[in-house]
Design a protein with these regions (language model features):
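Intrinsically disordered, low-complexity regulatory segments of nuclear proteins
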Residues: 2-4
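Non-heme Fe(II) oxygenase metal-center motifs and adjacent flexible, charged/small-residue loops
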Residues: 8-283
Length: 283
């Protein structure tokens, strides 16, 4: 991938790196940026984008795997369905992990510049929950889209940051569209500002069908668990994710159908033990 000095991308890289002068300290925070057909600042709030008719297929994951391994990028394909331990037939579900995918796209040794670009933004620390505006403790959020939007939490609208302010995120988004041979997706940010306190429990992404995500910061595992009739079925699966890693979910692995009771569905979680330690849904 050729680099052209003087471009907006190059200037953003230089500015971001200067903003975090000195050696990078071990991060105690983890950021996840999720590219998908739909984004939202919090469950039940404004949705951005239109739901696609289908998610990524196993064949699409394989194409991405082969393209990147040919470029020397370490990739790992995981089958989730063999870990379902129930009585009924189960759909195949796959997860593709791309090691240091961010570094590969940006041609950097780390994610310092990308984290700095996000740290410069005014993150959503409030959300509308059960009719009330409350402080967000589990994580902070943002959505990225074509136009800026100031938050109106009482109306269920969070902050949206336009692509023009985030050239590094935009570059990765465009790369994802290219390698998947798909349209550019929306982007949703989850900022786990303290990995010892933050997280998200077992859930499926019922708002979207496509997930191609990137991580930056401290290492933090992604967990998966099969469910049926609201009960865990089979062992919990743990996938280690590190600074700059990307992951791509095949359609079933997204968990779009996670609220269905009778069929086997798979949910995912991440963060501290409060959110990931128990696979049983909170009553």
């Amino acid at each position: 991938m050729k680099r052209c000095r003087g471009t907006t991308f190059e200037k953003a890289m230089s500015k971001a790196v200067k903003a975090v002068s000195g050696a990078k300290k071990e991060a105690k925070k983890t950021y996840t940026l999720t590219c998908g057909d739909v984004s939202e600042n919090h469950h039940g709030m404004q949705k951005n984008g239109e739901l696609h008719s289908h998610g990524y297929s196993y064949e699409t994951l394989c194409k991405v795997y082969h393209k990147l391994t040919a470029e020397g990028v370490a990739c790992e394909m995981y089958a989730l369905h063999p870990h379902y331990d129930g009585p009924d037939p189960v759909e195949e579900a796959w997860l593709l992990v791309i090691r240091k995918g961010v570094q590969h796209v940006l041609q950097t040794e780390d994610t310092v510049a990308l984290m700095a670009e996000n740290d410069a933004l005014d993150m959503d620390k409030h959300a509308l929950m059960k009719g009330r505006v409350v402080n967000k403790k589990a994580r902070w959020n943002l959505c990225f889209d074509d136009e800026d939007q100031e938050p109106d939490y009482e109306s269920g609208k969070g902050r949206i940051v336009a692509w023009k302010h985030i050239p590094l995120v935009s570059k990765i988004r465009e790369w994802i569209a290219e390698i998947t041979e798909d349209v550019p997706l929306k982007v949703e940010a989850n900022y786990y500002y303290d990995i010892e306190k933050c997280g998200i429990g077992y859930h499926g992404d019922g708002e979207r069908r496509k997930v191609f995500a990137m991580r930056m910061g401290a290492s933090m595992p992604l967990y998966y668990q099969w469910y049926q009739r609201s009960e865990p079925v089979g062992p919990r699966m743990k996938f280690e994710l590190h600074d700059g890693d990307m992951y791509m979910m095949e359609a079933k692995a997204v968990g779009f159908d996670w609220l269905k009771k009778n069929v086997p569905t798979v949910r995912h979680a991440t963060g501290c033990d409060e959110y990931t330690g128990s696979v049983r849904p909170k009553k």
